[in-house]
A protein has these predicted regions:
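N-terminal membrane-proximal hinge/A-helix region immediately C-terminal to the signal-anchor transmembrane segment
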Residues: 1-114, 136-145, 165, 201, ...
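Cytochrome P450 C-terminal beta-domain/meander region
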Residues: 55, 59, 65, 262-266, ...
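Cytochrome P450 heme-thiolate monooxygenase catalytic core
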Residues: 87-96, 130-292
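Cytochrome P450 I-helix active-site segment
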Residues: 132, 136, 190-197, 300-351, ...
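Cytochrome P450 fold signature focused on the C-terminal beta-domain
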Residues: 153, 243-258, 310-333, 347-369, ...
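Short, small-residue alpha-helix embedded
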Residues: 287-300, 438
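Cytochrome P450 heme-binding "Cys pocket" and the immediately downstream C-terminal segment
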Residues: 303-307, 411, 424, 428-465
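Conserved cytochrome P450 K-helix/beta-meander segment immediately N-terminal to the heme-binding cysteine loop
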Residues: 379-407
Length: 480
């Protein structure tokens, strides 16, 4: 049973927002209150808010005491792409505590942009390409484990295996050290489960940041090792300490950051490096897992798309264009496979949460609606991605072909699964890199079907929308 907690407040109590002549604003004058929904038990805040926007044909829906969800297309440029401060919700992402401010948790746009510049070398596509041999080490082991599961007819829980793969790849690329998840085939020290619990905690306590500073955000908790994902933190700390003692240069992210520190110590501290490493892994792995699952799941729901994707891959294989360990440069030349991935970004964005910004001094006007200084205005990728004016009348269906038909620039401009503007995800190049490789490998080498084809997957919106509960049978494909 879905149990939700809501905060219903008439808009007229929020000074400066009431305008009863404006039907585009869902407010108290319509006897409908907009809920602020927290997933205490399994719930779908993204669908709740989407339906409020649609039901009342409103671009503006109040979702908390001081926050308005905006679905108008102009919101992407005026809110997310503007250099205005983020809401305090983001400070929850300082891990392991508030001393470690990373790009995600930095609220001030100027300081955020400076951090991005200092860390950008590690995230560049050219640097990630140099780490491909490390990614291949994990990919090869991943193939071995899938072969074992295939040979033993053991059902595959992709929510686990994609997470294992993503965490280990991120460990290798960030500081050349795998976490060992794929090797063990288990969630070591419950690190992944605890990461999910932490995201759940953030989705609720993010509304009460002061409480976070008294509990998990308090440095005392991290010093005592009471953080829920200590395996991730411990591995990061050991890797940084080992790298400082080891003069060997590796082409990983940490080496690039250490190079910046050696040349310009005033620009980047060890805390910055540790914070960036933890954020890269903690925020990156589950978003990659959610997206990989979305591609496979929706291809299974649409057999014609699955066949088309595998036919494209088989043709490339027959032409000798795919290596035993698929290279990124090969995978990006598969247009339908890339369209399937892009459609998964749209149809099931891993971040399905409203992204808040603070209206600056002097207020701002969005689509004719004035918002006073200090009000939170937020945009949800899930809602923008289901706008029929942007993505067409079939926006509620998974259709990779939309990305191969005619002009796609308008859709590209509103594809915000990695965010946009100064707060765009710094790890997006790496995510695209490893997703392209692992999905091509999976579809080339295995036949996949759900154990119970009639059962739908499950997911809850807890900032991230990471699916689970759709076990699959796999078997090695026989190619001519």
């Amino acid at each position: 049973m879905q149990d939700i907690m809501t905060l219903a407040t008439p808009l007229e109590k929020l000074h400066g927002l009431r305008n009863q002549d404006d039907e585009d604003f869902l407010d108290g004058s319509q006897s409908v209150y907009a809920p602020r929904i927290c997933s205490v038990q399994p719930g779908h805040t993204e669908e709740e808010i989407l339906q409020l926007h649609r039901k009342h044909v409103g671009h503006f829906v109040r979702i908390s005491e001081n926050e308005v969800s905006v679905s108008h297309p102009d919101a992407v440029k005026q809110i997310l792409q503007a250099n205005i401060a983020k809401g305090t919700f983001y400070s929850m992402f300082s891990l392991p505590d508030y001393h470690y401010i990373n790009q995600m948790s930095e609220l001030d746009p100027t300081r955020h942009i400076q951090k991005t510049r200092n860390l950008s070398a590690g995230f560049s596509l050219s640097n990630i390409a140099k780490t491909e041999p490390y990614i291949d080490t994990v990919l090869q082991l991943f193939q071995t484990r899938l072969n074992e599961l295939s040979d033993s007819a053991t059902p595959v829980e992709f929510q686990n295996w994609f997470s294992f793969f993503a965490f280990d790849v991120l460990g290798e690329v960030t500081f050349s050290k795998s976490f060992g998840f794929v090797q063990s085939g288990t969630d070591i020290r419950n690190a992944i489960a605890n990461t999910g619990s932490l995201v759940y905690y953030i989705s609720i306590i993010g509304n009460y940041v002061w409480f976070h500073y008294l509990t998990l955000g308090n440095p005392i908790f991290s010093r005592l090792g009471l953080q829920p994902n200590s395996h991730i933190f411990d591995t990061c700390l050991l890797a940084i300490d080992s790298r400082k003692k080891n003069p060997e240069v590796r082409h990983d992210m940490m080496q690039r950051w250490l190079d910046v520190r050696a040349t310009h110590p005033e620009r980047i501290t060890e805390q910055d490096i540790f914070g960036a490493a933890v954020a890269n892994i903690g925020a990156g792995a589950e978003t990659i897992s959610a997206t990989a699952q979305a591609v496979v799941y929706y291809l299974l729901q649409c057999p014609e798309y699955l066949k088309r994707a595998q036919d494209e891959i088989d043709a490339a294989q027959a032409r000798g264009e795919l290596s035993p360990l698929v290279q990124y440069s090969e995978a990006v030349k598969l247009p339908f496979l890339q369209a399937c991935l892009k459609e998964a970004y749209r149809f099931h964005p891993a971040v399905a949460h409203n992204l808040p910004r603070v209206v600056p001094k002097g207020g701002m006007t969005i689509a004719g609606r004035y918002f006073p200084e200090g009000v939170l205005v937020s945009v949800n990728p899930w809602i923008i991605h289901r706008n029929p004016d942007i993505f067409g009348p079939d926006c509620d269906t998974y259709n990779p072909s939309r990305w191969l038909q005619g002009e796609t620039k308008k859709m590209d401009a509103f594809l915000i699964h990695w965010g946009t503007g100064y707060n765009q995800c710094p790890g997006r190049n790496l995510a695209q890199f490893e997703l392209s490789k692992v999905l091509t490998t999976l579809l080339r080498d295995y036949e996949i079907e759900q154990v119970n084809p009639k059962n739908e997957w499950k997911f809850e919106t807890r900032f991230l929308a990471v699916p689970y509960g759709w076990p699959c049978k796999i078997r090695r494909r026989q190619r001519g």
